[in-house]
Amino acid sequence: MTATEQLTKKLIRVGHSPDPDDAFMFYALAKDKIDLGSYEFEHILQDIQTLNERATRGELDISAISIHAYAHVSETYALLPSGASMGDGYGPTLVAKKKFSREEIARKKIAVPGKMTSAFLALHLWLAD
């Protein structure tokens, strides 16, 4: 690649978590396994809540975000037709030292990965039933 070609590359900032599923999705870009043409990608690895917050400020060109956060950024970002980190047996999990009823859980203090995460939304919807 010539110096002129290097100067004309368009930089795209991509935010994703360091989790294995995101690492898999972005591996080919990060390791130069595909021809990027006139694009250059900067990988920004952060936790999902931080990525959600950055998306609300429009700081990244492309970003992994929670589906819950998408409701807050749908005017700025478009959903891609693939990619997801939830499914049967995978996704938000509530962990406790002993078993509690839903009513007991509703009265407990619960740690969540962020208020704009799918885990928080799922918990909120489950407790509201």
Roles of regions detected by a PLM:
Residues 1-85, 89:
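N-terminal hydrophobic or amphipathic helices and topogenic motifs
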Residues 7, 11-31, 92-129:
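Bilobed "Venus flytrap"/periplasmic-binding protein-like clamshell domains
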